[in-house]
Swiss-Prot record:
One of its GO terms (molecular function) is ATP binding. CDD domains: PurM (cd02196). It catalyses: 2-formamido-N(1)-(5-O-phospho-beta-D-ribosyl)acetamidine + ATP = 5-amino-1-(5-phospho-beta-D-ribosyl)imidazole + ADP + phosphate + H(+). GO terms for biological process: 'de novo' IMP biosynthetic process; adenine biosynthetic process. Pathway: Purine metabolism; IMP biosynthesis via de novo pathway; 5-amino-1-(5-phospho-D-ribosyl)imidazole from N(2)-formyl-N(1)-(5-phospho-D-ribosyl)glycinamide: step 2/2. This is Phosphoribosylformylglycinamidine cyclo-ligase. Its EC number is 6.3.3.1. It comes from Shewanella woodyi (strain ATCC 51908 / MS32). It is an enzyme of class 6 (ligase). It is found in: Cytoplasm. The gene is purM. SUPFAM superfamilies: PurM C-terminal domain-like (SSF56042), PurM N-terminal domain-like (SSF55326). Belongs to the AIR synthase family. One of its GO terms (cellular component) is cytosol. HAMAP family: AIRS.
Length: 345
C-alpha cells in the first residue's frame, strides 16, 4: 500500500506566504493614511478608531461600494494602480453628500489565485484614495479562493465610515425653489456605465489603445474617479449648502431626485458645459441616445451642489481655488406632481 501524499493549503491553491508578502508590501502605503484617532496597528482581529473630539453630537455615516465592470478593463489591460482610488472615491464621495468627514476605510479583495504584484498595486491605490479623502485605511480582507474566480480575475469592495455633527447633517430638506445648482467637473466616466462602455468597444471594434485628443482611449476610460471630499468639506465650513448629489449609476435622472423634496425639481442648463471628449466618443460610436447618456453616465459632472443663490459666487471662487472645475449649472424650481424632478434644457 503506497503512502498517501501529504497535502498542504498551497496544494489546494491558497498561498499563505503570498498573502504575507502582500502585507509586507503595503505597510508603508497604509501608514501614509494614518489619522490620530486610529488605535493599534494593521493586522489585528478588529480595527479600532476613536471619534474625533471636536464633535459634540457625532453621527456615524457608513457606505459601501465597488468598482463594477471597470475592473474588467483594468484586468485585461493590466492597469491595477488606479482602481483602488476608484474604490475609495465611490464610498467617500457618497459620505460627503451627507456632510460627513470620512474617518476610516476597509477593503475586500477576492481572487482565485493571488497575484502579489497586482494586489500590491491595487491596495497602494486604495491607500492613495484614502490620502485624497483624508480617511485611514485601518483594515481589509484578502481572500484567495481557488475555483471561484477565473485566471487573474479579482473583485473589490470597499467600506467607509465617516462622522458628521448631528445639527449639520445635509439631507436635502432645506432645498427650496430659487436655490442655485453648482456642478463639479468629473475626471471621466468615473466608475459607472462600464458594461455599456465595454459594449460600445465591442460593437464599434475600436482599438482601446487608439488616441483620443492625444491620450489613449483606455487611459480616458480608466482615469480614476475624482474625490471631492476635501474641497467640499472646506465649502461646508464657509458656505450654506442645502443638498449634494453624487452623480453615479443612473446619472442625472436617478441621483439628483434622491436629495430633493417632492415639490422641487432641478432645472439643468445643458449648454452650461461641454461634455468631455470621451462621452462624445461613446455617444457617437455606440449610437447612444442623449437621454440614455444622461441616465447612464455623469457626462462630465461628478457632483451637483444645491445652495442659496446669493452664495454661488463665493462657492465657485472657493471650489475653483481648491482645484475643482466648478460652474453654475442650473437652479431649483417648484414642481407639479405630473412633472419629472430633473429637466435638462
Amino acid at each position: 500500500m503506497s503512502t498517501p501524499t501529504q497535502l498542504s493549503y498551497k496544494d489546494a491553491g491558497v498561498d499563505i506566504d503570498a498573502g504575507n508578502a502582500l502585507v509586507d508590501n503595503i505597510k508603508t502605503a497604509v501608514k501614509r493614511t494614518h489619522r490620530p484617532e486610529v488605535m493599534g496597528n494593521l493586522g489585528g482581529f478588529g480595527a479600532l478608531c476613536e471619534l474625533p473630539t471636536k464633535y459634540k453630537h457625532p453621527v456615524l455615516v457608513s457606505g459601501t461600494d465597488g468598482v463594477g465592470t471597470k475592473l474588467r478593463l483594468a484586468i485585461d489591460y493590466k492597469k491595477h494602480d488606479t482602481v483602488g482610488i476608484d474604490l475609495v472615491a465611490m464610498c467617500s464621495n457618497d459620505l460627503i453628500v451627507s456632510g460627513a468627514e470620512p474617518l476610516f476605510f476597509l477593503d475586500y479583495y477576492a481572487t482565485g489565485k493571488l497575484d502579489v504584484d497586482a494586489a500590491t498595486a491595487v491596495v497602494k491605490g486604495i491607500a492613495e484614495g484614502c490620502v485624497q479623502s483624508g480617511c485611514a485605511l485601518i483594515g481589509g480582507e484578502t481572500a484567495e479562493m481557488p475555483g471561484m474566480y477565473e485566471g487573474d480575475d479579482y473583485d473589490l469592495a470597499g467600506f467607509c465610515v465617516g462622522v458628521v455633527e448631528k445639527e449639520e447633517i445635509i439631507d436635502g430638506t432645506k432645498v427650496v425653489a430659487g436655490d442655485s445648482l453648482i456642478a463639479l467637473g468629473a475626471s471621466g466616466p468615473h466608475s459607472n456605465g462600464f458594461s455599456l462602455i465595454r459594449k460600445v468597444l465591442e460593437v464599434s471594434g475600436a482599438n482601446p489603445e487608439q488616441e483620443l485628443e492625444g491620450k489613449a482611449l483606455i487611459d480616458h476610460l480608466l482615469e480614476p474617479t475624482k474625490i471631492y471630499v476635501k474641497s467640499l468639506l472646506k465649502l461646508l465650513e464657509q458656505t450654506e449648502v442645502h443638498a449634494m448629489a453624487h452623480i453615479t449609476g443612473g446619472g442625472f435622472w436617478e441621483n439628483i431626485p434622491r436629495v430633493l423634496p417632492d415639490d422641487c425639481k432641478a432645472v439643468i442648463q445643458g449648454d452650461s458645459w461641454q461634455w468631455p471628449s470621451i462621452f462624445n466618443w461613446l455617444m457617437e460610436n455606440g449610437n447612444i441616445a442623449e437621454f440614455e447618456m444622461y441616465r447612464t453616465f455623469n457626462c462630465g459632472v461628478g457632483m451637483v451642489v444645491a445652495l442659496p443663490s446669493d452664495k454661488v459666487e463665493a462657492a465657485l471662487t472657493l471650489l475653483n481655488a481648491e482645484g475643482e472645475k466648478a460652474w453654475l449649472i442650473g437652479e431649483i424650481a417648484k414642481r407639479d406632481d405630473s412633472e419629472e424632478q430633473v429637466e435638462i434644457l
